[in-house]
Structure formats: structure tokens, C-alpha cells
Amino acid sequence: PPRQKRKAAVPAHGRYEGRKASATMKSLAGAYEAIAAWGVVPEVCEMDAYDWSDPQGKTIVLTNLVALPSGAWERLDDFVRKGGRMIATGLTGFYDQNMHCILMDDFPLRRCFGAQISEYKAVAPYFTIACDTPATTLPAHLWKGILRPDRAQAIAMHGDDVVGTRHRYGKGEAVWLPSLIELGGWHGDNKGVADFYGTYCRGQIDRAPLHFSRPADGVLMRLMESPSQRLAVLVNKRPHAVEIGLSRPLPASARRLCGEASPRGTSVRLGAEECAVFLWDKQAE
């Protein structure tokens, strides 16, 4: 269905979204949606199935991964130290696999993040965070995680509290924003979350052969290719027409196989609920 603001009234019994069993999966879905708004396809992967052997230039996202098993700690530290970027949000790393809190005292990823948790505070069902890098306002839900930076740079504030950091560690970087920003965006305006992921996943976005030049909420693009051709499928799930900015113009020889959309330079207009398919030869790029 077309994306709408999904903000609901706080239940009388006080069981907020962030306390429900679905919070982790909805956080993952919110991050996926925010990255997909740039016209790219993020990969969802189970930790043991992920290839950790070559982290250089790669980015992983841990969205509200409340239980972080001890077997993953060294892999995550190595991933960043050897050139990867790790983004952690929400209550990621609150427990280990035995439900022991690992954020207090000797946090195993403290050197990697360059910071540690001071405390989590319940603020409001929905509130906003001021982010410096990128310069945007992030929606958040229920809790804010307050950080005590060691060597990390503060990138987000809530009042006088540091609630987001980035830290160069070895050859890589760790970005930590321990508030439920994906759930905040899920129930409200997701633009700030899309801007956040657009900044910290920029390398992966720019490596795509074609992507959106600005986030397009409710629009998806998928690319397929053969050795000689490329095919782009664009779907607008909004109830109204949208103008999509592309990272580069489609080749003049691109053929429209489906839909009514016509590209004009670096933009394409899609009607309400429209699907458009374009095919072109790679040598024309």
C-alpha cells in the first residue's frame, strides 16, 4: 500500500511500540525503507551468513538489535578496524545472548564506538533529535540513549545531551545513534531518517549504476542486468504523481517497455500507482 503516516494513539495500557516484540523487525523495515528511498536495494542478512572477510568500503547497519551475542563482538570490532563502517541505532547491544546487560561497565565495543552509554531515558511517545551530520531533524520514539564520548565526535543532540556519535577506528568508522529513529520515522515523517542513511551509506549508494539524486518516499527502483543490457523497474506507490530525480540521465536509446513515464534529463515523472520499465544497452551509458 502507499506509505502514509502511521502514527497511532498511545494505547491505554501503556505498551508502546518500542516495547513490543515487533519493535526490532519494524526498526529493520524502517531502515530498509529509508535506504530504499534512494533507489537502491539494501541487503538483509543474518550475521552468521554474512561474509566478514573483506570489510573495506562496506557498511553494515544494526537497527535496534537489542540482543548482541558475544560471538559477534570480535567480528564487529574487526569489521570496523579493517575498513568497514558500522551504524548502530536503537537499543543495539543492550543485552548479550543470555540477557545480561553489556552496556554498563566493560562494554565490549567501547573502543570501537569511542563512547559508552550514560543511560536511556524515556522521553515521549514521539520526539525529535537535532542532527549535525547530516544537518537534519531525526524523528525518534520513546527512549533516547545518552552517550558519554571518549574519542568519538558528537553528531546529534537532544537538549544538552549527546545522543549520536561517529568515531574513526582503525581504517573504518562506527556511527552510534542509540534512539529508535526508525520507529519514529515509521510513524511519522521518514525524511530525516532517509537523509541520515543517505549520508552514512553514501559510498554504497553512489556505486549503484543508477540511483535517485534525492530520497523519494513511496517509490522503489530495482535494477537488473545482463552482460550487455540493463533494465530499470520504477514503481510509484503514492496516490499522486511524483517527479523523481535520477543520478544521471537515462541513455537516449533507452526503450520504455511498460508504463507511460518519459524521462527528461535527470528526472522522470511517474503517475499515481504507476510502474515503468526501461531497457538499454550498457555501451550507451
Task: Please state what every model-predicted region is.
Residues 1-57:
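Aromatic-Pro/Gly-enriched surface loop or interdomain linker
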Residues 63-285:
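A conserved amphipathic helix/loop scaffold
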